[in-house]
Curated annotation (Swiss-Prot):
Belongs to the IspH family. The gene is ispH. It is an enzyme of class 1 (oxidoreductase). This is 4-hydroxy-3-methylbut-2-enyl diphosphate reductase. The keyword 4Fe-4S applies. It comes from Desulfovibrio desulfuricans (strain ATCC 27774 / DSM 6949 / MB).
């Protein structure tokens, strides 16, 4: 089988930085005396089950409530960021805080705060229950609405005479956002547009589209909780070919690749190279 592997597959800059900060915290704690505080993350550091399981074996504790923190803990903020309110509670806990928020997400948070400082309504394109989106919304100084598609946007009671700010979750589909941007620009008199989709997301999606147009089937490797991985699968599937989103090579089935000699392989921004390598090896063996 001919496997075409995406060059952009695997860890993005934000994920690499977050894990580097977590590893540094673990190394420093290892050099301290017994009985030192815990290394904690505020929610999963990234959305990949294998990576999270590895850190759990190394003693990292995942907490979802700042009230669970102790003064001698090191609290590592997840790559997706957290809400302003949670961050304040973390700082008040007395724990040592390590901010591993992706720089692109942090920039989006601050851009939203500045753009809405006079009370403009935020329109955020994203997944309402995603931790990054909850964090972005918390930085809005005025009202805020989250929508996941054009239908949800059309249902919002927008007043053309009021000021609005349009932004996006950093891992959303760039083409869909551009279409939404053009539509709102025609409908609203006062619209500020923030470019918050990161370049890595755009490049991965463009490469996935390109590969999907020249193969018989696509495989996307990554955690099912990973929004950017799910969107890569969606982008590939739009080309009309079978697309399989798996967390590891163990989920691949030979029957899905029968009479399909060309396969495309990509992976989410939180997928380790080892998992991509394993999937490529499995596919190449067919």
């Amino acid at each position: 089988m001919n496997v075409r592997r995406a060059k952009t597959a695997g860890f993005c800059m934000g994920v690499s930085l977050a894990l580097q900060k977590l590893n540094t915290a673990l190394e420093r704690r290892a050099g301290q005396s017994a009985g030192a505080g815990r290394i904690c993350t505020l929610g999963p550091i990234i959305h990949n089950p294998q990576v999270l399981a590895e850190y759990e074996t190394r003693g990292v504790v995942c907490v979802n409530d700042p009230a669970q923190l102790r003064q001698d803990d090191v609290a590592v903020i997840r790559a997706h960021g957290i809400t302003r309110q949670v961050e304040q509670a973390v700082c008040a806990s007395g724990a040592t805080v390590v901010d591993a928020t992706c720089p692109k997400v942090k920039k989006a948070q601050l851009s939203i705060a500045r753009a809405t400082s006079q009370g403009a309504t935020l329109l955020l394109f994203g997944e309402e229950d995603h931790p990054e989106v909850r964090g972005l919304i918390s930085y809005a100084c005025g009202p805020a609405h989250v929508f996941g598609n054009a239908v949800e946007l059309a249902a919002l009671p927008l007043d053309p005479a009021q000021p609005y700010v349009l932004a996006s979750q950093t891992t959303q589909d760039r083409e869909i956002f551009t279409s939404i941007q053009e539509s709102l620009s025609r409908a609203l008199d006062d619209l500020t547009i923030l470019s918050t989709i990161c370049d890595a997301t755009r490049e991965r999606q463009e490469e996935a589209r390109n590969i999907a147009s020249s193969v018989d089937v696509m495989v996307v490797v990554g955690g099912r909780q990973s929004g950017n991985t799910r969107r890569l699968a969606d982008v590939a599937a739009l080309n009309g070919i079978a697309t399989y989103h798996v967390e590891s090579a163990e989920e691949l089935e030979p029957k899905n690749f029968a009479n399909k000699p060309r396969v495309g392989l990509t992976a989410g921004a939180s997928t380790p190279k080892s998992l991509i390598d394993a999937a490529e090896k499995w596919l190449s063996s067919l």
